[in-house]
């Protein structure tokens, strides 16, 4: 994990993230237009908006995987990212896939596996896991990181109702410890006191730029 001294001092206690007037283009297409938001300890923000509104792009920009064309993303601590890909090596067991994350992180592998009902699968090659089991394994990697800020892009893909409930319990526990998260999802999450941030469709702006 990054040393705390590598991050700026939060402007207020508990602040984990400031996104200030972020604009992103993809080629000639305007994807995000002046997005601003803040995230504090205990927050759970759900990104809403139509398909193509830039929800995944915003998460990638916050994570540092892409740079904004204008504006600024200010993080005050480490983050953990869950993208669309589960990123498991098929020939390695579940335990082997998560070993590096455990080594680099600060949380217990056994605790993460138990919380996500994966303990009985540790010696199974990843190629034999179901899509839901792979998704839970990817989420275990987020838990192992020890980061306070979680960016979760469609975390419930492939999960059944029971697994979504487990995920909700893990997310609630993370918030209770001072963590926070930004989530994109197409299904309701079992979380209380969430905030929503709507990203509008910019299709009309795209037509303007390309005309």
From Swiss-Prot:
GO terms for cellular component: plasma membrane. It catalyses: heme b(in) + ATP + H2O = heme b(out) + ADP + phosphate + H(+). It is found in: Cell inner membrane. It is an enzyme of class 7 (translocase). PROSITE patterns: ABC_TRANSPORTER_1, ABC_TRANSPORTER_2, CCMA. GO terms for biological process: cytochrome complex assembly. Keywords: ATP-binding, Cell inner membrane, Cell membrane, Cytochrome c-type biogenesis, Membrane, Nucleotide-binding, Translocase, Transport. SUPFAM superfamilies: P-loop containing nucleoside triphosphate hydrolases. Its main location: membrane. It is a peripheral membrane protein. Residues 17-209 form the ABC transporter domain. Its EC number is 7.6.2.5. InterPro entries: AAA+_ATPase, ABC_transporter-like_ATP-bd, ABC_transporter-like_CS, ABC_transptr_haem_export_CcmA, P-loop_NTPase. It comes from the Bacteria. Belongs to the ABC transporter superfamily. CcmA exporter (TC 3.A.1.107) family. The complex is composed of two ATP-binding proteins (CcmA) and two transmembrane proteins (CcmB). This is Cytochrome c biogenesis ATP-binding export protein CcmA. It comes from Gluconobacter oxydans (strain 621H) (Gluconobacter suboxydans).
């Amino acid at each position: 994990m990054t040393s705390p001294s590598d991050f700026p001092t939060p402007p207020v206690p508990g602040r984990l993230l400031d996104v200030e007037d972020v604009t992103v283009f993809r080629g000639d297409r305007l994807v995000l237009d002046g997005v601003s938001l803040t995230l504090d300890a205990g927050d759970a923000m759900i990104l809403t908006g139509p398909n193509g509104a830039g929800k995944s792009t915003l998460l990638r920009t916050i994570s540092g995987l892409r740079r904004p064309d204008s504006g600024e993303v200010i993080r005050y601590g480490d983050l953990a990212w869950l993208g669309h890909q589960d990123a498991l090596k098929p020939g390695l067991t579940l335990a082997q896939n998560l070993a590096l994350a455990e080594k680099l992180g600060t949380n217990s592998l056994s605790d993460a596996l138990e919380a996500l009902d994966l303990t009985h699968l540790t010696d199974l090659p990843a190629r034999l896991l179901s899509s839901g089991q792979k998704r839970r394994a990817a989420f275990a990697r987020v838990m192992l990181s020890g980061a306070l800020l979680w960016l979760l892009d469609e975390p419930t893909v492939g999960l059944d109702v029971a697994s979504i409930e487990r995920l909700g319990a893990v997310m609630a526990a993370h918030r209770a410890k001072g963590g926070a998260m930004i989530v994109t999802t197409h299904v309701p999450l079992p979380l209380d006191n969430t905030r929503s941030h709507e990203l509008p469709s910019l299709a009309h702006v795209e037509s303007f730029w390309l005309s």
